[in-house]
């Protein structure tokens, strides 16, 4: 009886160690759990219904799907660009109809400025910057002169009636040229003439007028047949009559800006009065006069209060 009772639990235990389908339980064998998982994968793969039997074909369809998506994006961008072009076209037409100035691209404005400057070469007034006196200038003075050249050119580009500019006595291997390249962005593309030739040999002497503050003759008008010369000289030691003596050496006519005729000295803390101007300031006065034909108005733009002069009519 005792033996029979002990045997029955063993048979029951044997039955309990099997699942309904007769598979061994995981605790009986270490591989049984892996077998169950493998069986589940074999019985059901969620990708199986979507993936073609041929994996290469499935990959090809995936590439085609991405290609179609990319083509839709490209087509959408093209459509938006076309709509934007149409919008700008309508806007330009409306601006012209309303008499307002249309907005132009930077490239268009740059080309327009270049064309205007080139026209001045054939029909505009001529201005020569004499750069033959830079050999004794310090690095600081050369830097200041390079900055003045940049500002002069910038003013000429904006002028309604630009001058044609000559930079004479200007060697491309000189320290000043290197300083201009360093300080002035796009200097090599400036629309002007650069030459090593001296201004006195480049033009007939009778067509030249050297602008110098030491001249006895005030400049009365700007003549298109005359070449006006500005001395490209920055001298912190203030050597007097350098440009005047150079003009006399070549028997060239001289003139000064009519500061004395239209301005008077004013009291200042340092009791300082000077008619010596930077080359870009001289140019601004000439350019303003060419546009307005009004010396007081032109002088007001170029002669700063620090020079110790004010317009006569401002006192009256």
Swiss-Prot record:
GO biological process: protein insertion into mitochondrial inner membrane; tRNA N1-guanine methylation
Segments forming a coiled coil: 75-96
Chain segments carrying region Disordered: 1-30, 42-98
Molecular-function GO terms, alphabetical: tRNA (guanosine(9)-N1)-methyltransferase activity; tRNA binding
Reactions catalysed: guanosine(9) in tRNA + S-adenosyl-L-methionine = N(1)-methylguanosine(9) in tRNA + S-adenosyl-L-homocysteine + H(+)
Family matches, as CDD domains: Trm10euk_B
Pfam families tied to this protein: tRNA_m1G_MT
GO CC annotation terms, alphabetical: cytosol; mitochondrial inner membrane; nucleoplasm; nucleus; TIM22 mitochondrial import inner membrane insertion complex
Biased composition (Basic residues): 63-82
Chain intervals with Basic and acidic residues compositional bias: 83-95
Keyword Transport: no
Keyword annotations: Coiled coil, Methyltransferase, S-adenosyl-L-methionine, Transferase
Enzyme Commission numbers on file: 2.1.1.221
SAM-dependent MTase TRM10-type domain location: 113-310
Homology family: Belongs to the class IV-like SAM-binding methyltransferase superfamily. TRM10 family.
PANTHER family for this protein: TRNA (GUANINE-9-) METHYLTRANSFERASE, TRNA METHYLTRANSFERASE 10 HOMOLOG B
Its job: S-adenosyl-L-methionine-dependent guanine N(1)-methyltransferase that catalyzes the formation of N(1)-methylguanine at position 9 (m1G9) in tRNAs. Probably not able to catalyze formation of N(1)-methyladenine at position 9 (m1A9) in tRNAs.
Protein name (database record): tRNA methyltransferase 10 homolog B
Gene designation: Trmt10b
